[in-house]
C-alpha cells in the first residue's frame, strides 16, 4: 500500500520463534531480530560492533508455521516487511512507543551457512508473492514454476488481525499470473506453469 515503510533487516534471532493461533485458526509467529552494525577501525586494525537494533517481527499463516519449523535462536536471517509503530501505556501509566515489523518475506542468511529448501504445499491459500520473475496480471502465483489458474486466492493478514488494512497487494482480482521460473504470465502462451524449469527468467 502507498505510504507504508518497507524495510529489510539482516540480523540474528534473539529467541526461537513463538508460534500461536488466533481464535479463527490463523497461525502467527513472533520473533525478535538483533541487527548489529560492524565497522572496521583502521587504527586498531579490528572490527567493532555498533549499537544493536532489536526489532520484534510477526509473520502470518503458512509462512508462520514455516518460520517456526525452520528457524532457531542465533540463526542469521534476512527479514523484509512493513515497519509499524504502536503506542501503549505501561503499568506505571507511562506512554511508550514500540516499532514492529509485519513480515512479508523471511529467510536464512547463507553468508556463513548452508540450507536445503523444501517447498511446502499451500495449505493456507495465502496469495502470492511470485518467485524470480513472478508474472503480471491480477494475482501472482508463487515460487519457482508455480502458477495460479486465475482464481482469486486469499492473502494478507487474517480478518481478526488488528493491523489489517484494506485489500492485499495484487488486488485479488483474478486474471491469472504466472509464478516464477517456468510459470506462465497473465494469459500468454496458454501453459499452466505448474512445473519446474531450469530456464532462467531473463
UniProtKB/Swiss-Prot annotation:
GO CC annotation, single: nucleoid
Superkingdom of the organism of origin: Bacteria
Keywords recorded for this protein, A-Z: DNA-binding
Gene3D superfamilies assigned: Nucleic acid-binding proteins
Keyword Membrane: no
Biased amino acid composition, Gly residues: 124-157, 168-196
Cross-referenced InterPro entries: NA-bd_OB-fold (IPR012340), Primosome_PriB/ssb (IPR000424), ssDNA-bd (IPR011344)
Region Disordered, residue ranges: 115-202
Gene Ontology MF: a single term: single-stranded DNA binding
Pfam families associated with the record: SSB
CDD domains (alphabetical): SSB_OBF (cd04496)
Quaternary data: Homotetramer.
PANTHER family in UniProt: SINGLE-STRANDED DNA-BINDING PROTEIN (PTHR10302:SF27)
Name of this chain's protein: Single-stranded DNA-binding protein 1
Organism: Streptomyces avermitilis (strain ATCC 31267 / DSM 46492 / JCM 5070 / NBRC 14893 / NCIMB 12804 / NRRL 8165 / MA-4680)
Amino acid at each position: 500500500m502507498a505510504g507504508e515503510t518497507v524495510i529489510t533487516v539482516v540480523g540474528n534471532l534473539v529467541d526461537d520463534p513463538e508460534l500461536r493461533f488466533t481464535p479463527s485458526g490463523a497461525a502467527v509467529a513472533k520473533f525478535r531480530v538483533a541487527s548489529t552494525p560492524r565497522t572496521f577501525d583502521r587504527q586498531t586494525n579490528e572490527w567493532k560492533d555498533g549499537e544493536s537494533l532489536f526489532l520484534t517481527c510477526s509473520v502470518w499463516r503458512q509462512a508462520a508455521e514455516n518460520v517456526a519449523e525452520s528457524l532457531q535462536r542465533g540463526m542469521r536471517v534476512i527479514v523484509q516487511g512493513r515497519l509499524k509503530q504502536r503506542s501503549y501505556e505501561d503499568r506505571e501509566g507511562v506512554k511508550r512507543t514500540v516499532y514492529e515489523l509485519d513480515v512479508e518475506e523471511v529467510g536464512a542468511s547463507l553468508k556463513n551457512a548452508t540450507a536445503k529448501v523444501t517447498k511446502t504445499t499451500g495449505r493456507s491459500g495465502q496469495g502470492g508473492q511470485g518467485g524470480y520473475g513472478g508474472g503480471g496480471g491480477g494475482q501472482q502465483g508463487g515460487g519457482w514454476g508455480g502458477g495460479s489458474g486465475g482464481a482469486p486466492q486469499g492473502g494478507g493478514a487474517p480478518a481478526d488481525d488488528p493491523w489489517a488494512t484494506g485489500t492485499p497487494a495484487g488486488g485479488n482480482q483474478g486474471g491469472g499470473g504466472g509464478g516464477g521460473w517456468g510459470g506462465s504470465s497473465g494469459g500468454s502462451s496458454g501453459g499452466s506453469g505448474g512445473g519446474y524449469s531450469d530456464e532462467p527468467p531473463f
